[in-house]
UniProtKB/Swiss-Prot annotation:
Name of the encoding gene: flp-18
A single GO cellular-component term on record: extracellular region
Main location, first listed in the record: secreted
Coiled coil (residue ranges): none
GO biological process: neuropeptide signaling pathway; regulation of muscle contraction; sleep
UniProt modified residues of type Phenylalanine amide: 93, 111, 129, 147, 169, 180, 205
Tissue spec. comment: Expressed in head neurons and weakly in ventral nerve cord. Expressed in the interneurons AVA, AIY and RIG, the motor neuron RIM and the pharyngeal neurons M2 and M3. EMPGVLRF-amide: Expressed in cholinergic pharyngeal motoneurons M2 and M3.
Propeptide section residues: 22-83, 97-101, 115-119, 133-137, 151-158, 184-195
UniProtKB keywords: Amidation, Cleavage on pair of basic residues, Neuropeptide, Repeat, Secreted, Signal
GO molecular function, a single term: neuropeptide Y receptor binding
Name of the protein: FMRFamide-like neuropeptide 18
Modifications after synthesis and translation: May be processed by convertase egl-3.
Function: FMRFamide-like neuropeptides. Ligand to G-protein coupled receptor npr-1. Involved in modulating locomotion quiescence during the sleep-like state called lethargus which occurs during molting between larval and adult stages, acting via npr-1. Together with flp-1, plays a homeostatic role by acting on the GABAergic neural transmission at neuromuscular junctions to prevent overexcitation of the locomotor circuit. Plays a role in the navigational capacity of sperm and the targeting of sperm derived from males to the fertilization site in the uterus of hermaphrodites.
């Protein structure tokens, strides 16, 4: 008898626990007066499908912007002269500076074609993470991850352009280079260092 009473007690506890688990929560709705300014901002940022997006900075360079499509033109003088023209398909995360410097803060992820300078063109499919230096120097800090073709350093330091498919982390002359592709066909000495050849498909990490 005591055995069955224990079973019934356990069953009742389980039933009560299940009933409490399915209890609907009660929410308190607080009605507040919304200022007219907030209503206007919400209307301006509301899309046709009802989605509301946060307002961007005045200069259009708010960090953390994920954008797909075409921005305003630099030479068209739409709203301001600091807007940069880019082809559709640009995916960028990060804040850029003004168009005369063409700088990007670390954390820029971009896919698309850059064509604001003829000597700095990149083929479509460029994936780059890192900060670029002054555009006339064409240098990049360590931490650049890029997939695409480089063709603007063909005349400097006896370096030829690289074939598409180059994956590189770090600067060219610092230890820790991870690269897939063809380096150079030259066997000449530069600054006392022998330029080594690499066949396409070489994955290397370490010193040159």
């Amino acid at each position: 008898m005591q055995r069955w009473s224990g079973v019934l007690l356990i069953s009742l506890c389980c039933l009560l626990r299940g009933a409490l688990a399915y209890t609907e929560p009660i929410y308190e709705i607080v009605e507040e007066d919304i200022p007219a300014e907030d209503i206007e901002v919400t209307r301006t940022n509301e899309k046709q499908d009802g989605r509301v997006f946060s307002k961007r900075d005045f200069d259009g360079a708010m960090p953390g912007v994920l954008r797909f499509g075409k921005r305003g033109g630099v030479w068209e003088k739409r709203e301001s002269s600091v807007q940069k023209k880019e082809m559709p398909g640009v995916l960028r995360f990060g804040k850029r500076a003004y168009f005369d410097e063409k700088k990007s803060v670390p954390g820029v992820l971009r896919f698309g074609k850059r064509s604001y300078f003829d000597e700095k063109k990149s083929v479509p499919g460029v994936l780059r993470f890192g900060k670029r230096d002054v555009p006339m120097d064409k240098r990049e800090i360590p931490g650049v991850l890029r997939f695409g073709k480089r063709d603007y350093m063909a005349d400097s330091f006896d370096k030829r352009s690289e074939v598409p498919g180059v994956l590189r982390f770090g600067k060219r002359d610092v230890p820790g280079v991870l690269r897939f592709g063809k380096r150079s066909d030259l066997e000449e000495h530069y600054a006392g260092v022998l330029l080594k050849k690499s066949v396409p498909g070489v994955l290397r990490f370490g010193r040159k």
